[in-house]
Amino acid sequence: MSRRGTAEKRTAKSDPIFRNRLVNMVVNRIMKDGKKSLAYQILYRAVKKIQQKTETNPLLVLRQAIRRVTPNIGVKTRRNKKGSTRKVPIEIGSKQGRALAIRWLLEASQKRPGRNMAFKLSSELVDAAKGSGGAIRKKEATHRMAEANRALAHFR
């Protein structure tokens, strides 16, 4: 733990084409081994496919998908005095929820069958915006787990 004080939170930069911070957050999560230009290519191709599929603004589809997948409540594993572990429901803030939503969308799109990542990502984003898809199932499973363990909420 640092003794110098708390580091100030850095804000995400906006991407060069859409001038949007959310797009840059998604690109940073797509990126592997520092290959940011490849991550931009994947996202921009996915955005083009969304434009072709829905004929609406693809940024609105992206925002809608992330908003639908963002969880309000989650579970955190806690160990009690006897050594058994319990999943305690906790509230999730907006920033952490957005980060989880982006992560879940990318994981669900990677698991999809398909040709390339851009195609899979575009399909997952369109499905999530409509209220279906793997990321939505993940959110619902998390909410179900938190609801089932609601009696343990006082263990925080």
Curated annotation (Swiss-Prot):
The keyword Glycoprotein does not apply. PROSITE patterns: RIBOSOMAL_S7. GO terms for molecular function: mRNA binding; rRNA binding; structural constituent of ribosome. One of its GO terms (biological process) is ribosomal small subunit assembly. SUPFAM superfamilies: Ribosomal protein S7 (SSF47973). PANTHER family: RIBOSOMAL PROTEIN S7. This is Small ribosomal subunit protein uS7cz/uS7cy. It comes from Sorghum bicolor. The gene is rps7-A.
